[in-house]
């Protein structure tokens, strides 16, 4: 077998210098048949036959390849090393060296790295969207410091496909009610609604994925889409390029927003900061295709958005049973309802930031939704002492240690500490608290504060002060029209009775 240099010399001597095959054979030391074969084949680079010899490792290569693939998926602490694999191969009959196993492992690793670098790369068509045509949505996870703690947050991200204007809103959880709330706030910031929304197959919208474009969409999500009058389009599974703008926005936001973000006192403060920061970035960033800023492109697109309707009632409803202690359980926490609904089934409407209890077609209670460090704070009870007044009137002794009454207003607490030292004071205090069922609570508190200022408060004193505070002013005199006025108005003169009496006596 000759090398490239000799083949090049043979071709040059024959085709350029005109040397005969005999002469070329003499110069190169090759046989005339060999020279003739390469000149007739017209190849410029010699082809070497593939090696067909079987190495000692060849029968064991499938097994070793399987072991390497399995161990690669494990954590580093749990992986077997090559020395252990070599011993197992020897036990199976391998007679080669450990170095040969290491060389094969290096080749396998290089091959896997090359596959990882080249996999997923394909050919795509650039997309272009008209003004007001579509927005893209996606969830992401990021961290922020809230009230001095590092908190993991679920970020709802929206981006207008034409202008590239984007909005972010943070939540503690990624649930249906958060998704609905995020849409309303995003549409408010954009000042309108595009014709179409592009989503992946997120669980907060899609219950199950069928063949092709077939989806079983969540009913509440469908209701929201119908309310806001846009069309929801879902991407193919594992096809992030179909909404590449928002996918890139997720990556860019970590650099532009979350790195170097300040500390926040609450989630509400964080969302206010996110809104202002996003709007500021619209003016700073250039549009990737248009010769203008994102803010300028958004100004052109905003006029094509549909006007906002009223907000969608963004709740998810569940049926709950009230306990005998007038509590409803949700996400490990407890919330109070009026005592008249104890041991009954009610409707719990779950919003992004509050819980509303309803029964018999009306709202019966409302509480802020409890959250902790990135997740629902569990094991807490949120009372409203008003809910227990009807029970307290029957059991006044429960006032002393009743958990719902631990957070009464300060004026009530101070009055309670005074009255409970007197005989029958617990019942008097219960009757004072029950006044809020029939009077404005602010007026009752004012009466209690005035009674405390006098130094010796009592139930009668509070009732007297409340009566004065709530007493209606005397009605204003009604003006009499001229047509109803008397020309000679009667006068109240009691002396006329004396004159009549004297006339009677004289008779």
UniProtKB/Swiss-Prot annotation:
Transmembrane region(s): none
Positions of the HTH IS21-type domain: 6-68
GO molecular function, one term: DNA binding
Keywords attached to this entry: DNA recombination, DNA-binding, Plasmid, Transposable element, Transposition
Superkingdom of source: Bacteria
Domain Integrase catalytic per the UniProt entry, residue ranges: 122-302
GO biological process, one term: DNA integration
Keyword field contains DNA-binding: yes
Keyword Cell inner membrane: no
DNA-binding region: 19-40
Role summary: Required for the transposition of the insertion element.
PANTHER family reported in the protein's UniProt record: INTEGRASE PROTEIN, TRANSPOSASE RV3428C-RELATED
Family: Belongs to the transposase IS21/IS408/IS1162 family.
Name of the protein: Transposase for insertion sequences IS1326/IS1353
Species per Swiss-Prot/TrEMBL record: Pseudomonas aeruginosa
């Amino acid at each position: 077998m000759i090398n490239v240099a000799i083949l090049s010399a043979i071709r040059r001597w024959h085709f350029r210098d005109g040397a005969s095959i005999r002469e070329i054979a003499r110069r190169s030391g090759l046989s005339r048949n060999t020279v003739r074969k390469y000149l007739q084949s017209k190849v410029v680079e010699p082809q070497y036959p593939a090696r067909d010899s079987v190495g000692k490792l060849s029968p064991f290569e499938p097994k070793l390849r399987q072991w390497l693939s399995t161990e690669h998926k494990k954590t580093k602490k749990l992986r077997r090393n090559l020395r252990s694999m070599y011993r197992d191969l020897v036990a199976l009959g391998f007679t080669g060296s450990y170095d040969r196993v290491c060389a094969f492992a290096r080749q396998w690793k290089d091959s896997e790295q090359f596959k990882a670098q080249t996999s997923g790369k394909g050919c795509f068509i650039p997309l272009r969207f008209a003004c007001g045509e579509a927005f893209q949505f996606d969830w992401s996870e990021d961290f922020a410091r809230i009230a001095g703690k590092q908190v993991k947050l679920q970020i709802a991200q929206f981006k207008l496909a034409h202008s590239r204007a984007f909005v972010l809103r943070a939540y503690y959880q990624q649930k249906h009610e958060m998704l609905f709330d995020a849409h309303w706030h995003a549409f408010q910031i954009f000042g309108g609604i595009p014709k179409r929304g592009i989503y992946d197959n997120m669980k907060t919208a899609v219950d199950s994925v069928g063949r092709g474009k077939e989806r079983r969409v969540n009913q509440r999500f469908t209701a929201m889409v119908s309310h806001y009058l846009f069309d929801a389009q879902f991407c193919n599974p594992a096809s992030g390029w179909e909404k590449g703008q928002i996918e890139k926005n997720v990556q860019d936001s970590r650099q532009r927003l979350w790195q170097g973000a300040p500390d926040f006192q609450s989630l509400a403060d964080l969302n206010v900061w996110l809104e202002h920061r996003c709007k500021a970035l619209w003016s700073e960033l250039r549009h990737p295709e248009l010769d203008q800023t994102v803010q300028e492109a958004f100004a052109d697109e905003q006029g094509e958005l549909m006007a906002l309707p009223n907000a969608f009632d963004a709740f998810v409803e569940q049926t709950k049973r009230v306990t005998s202690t007038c509590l409803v359980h949700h996400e490990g926490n407890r919330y109070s309802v009026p005592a008249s609904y104890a041991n009954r089934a009610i409707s719990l409407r779950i919003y992004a930031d509050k819980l509303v209890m309803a029964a018999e077609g009306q709202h019966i209670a409302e509480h802020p939704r409890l959250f902790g460090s990135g997740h629902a704070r569990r094991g807490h009870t949120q009372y409203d002492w008003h809910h227990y007044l009807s029970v307290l009137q029957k059991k006044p002794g429960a006032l002393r240690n009743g958990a719902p009454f631990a957070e009464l207003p300060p004026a009530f607490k101070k009055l309670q500490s005074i009255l409970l030292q007197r005989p029958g004071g617990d019942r008097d205090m219960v009757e004072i608290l029950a006044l809020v069922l029939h009077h404005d609570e602010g007026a009752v508190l004012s009466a209690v504060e005035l009674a405390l200022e006098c130094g010796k408060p009592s139930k009668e004193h509070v009732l007297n002060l409340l009566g004065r505070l709530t007493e209606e002013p005397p009605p204003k005199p009604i003006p009499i029209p001229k047509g109803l006025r008397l020309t000679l108005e009667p006068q109240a003169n009691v002396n006329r009775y004396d004159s009549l009496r004297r006339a009677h006596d004289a008779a």
